[in-house]
Amino acid sequence: MRAIKRIGFIFLLFATYSHAQIMVVSQNKVVFHKMKEYHELMEKHWNPIFDKLVDEGKLDEVGTLSHAWGDEWNIAGYYKAKDLASFEKAWNEGYEKFAESTPQNVRNKITSMIMEHKDSIYQLKHSHSRK
């Protein structure tokens, strides 16, 4: 009986998150004195790829948050998608294009600036914006 309940719970989670608008928040602890360079590299190599995915309707929105005062998670990227499956498809496409178009030494440099990283996937319960 426990196995059936567990399977039911997993199915409920899948059904809920696979059909609801989501926001993925990718938080980074970036070396403080490297933040400006990190943003410059991302603006050149990462952002145009994911902005294009929004323009093509594959993602709903992308953005970057940054602060120099507060907690240690000083740079975050966020991605809104109509559902988890759409996000995963767009993410895979975007990351593949990034890897193909960005020299390995630049990717290594970006990675070396990140001391720690974590991702969270949120189901949007309320969102209002003027478009």
Which functions belong to the PLM regions below?
Residues 14-20:
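Sec/Tat signal peptide C-region and signal peptidase I cleavage site
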Residues 69, 88, 125-131:
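A beta-strand edge to alpha-helix "cap/lid" segment located at domain peripheries
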Residues 2-10:
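Sec-dependent signal peptide recognition
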Residues 21-40:
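Short N-terminal segments immediately surrounding and downstream of signal-peptide cleavage
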Residues 22-24, 73-75, 115:
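Residues that flank catalytic or metal-binding motifs in active/ligand-binding sites
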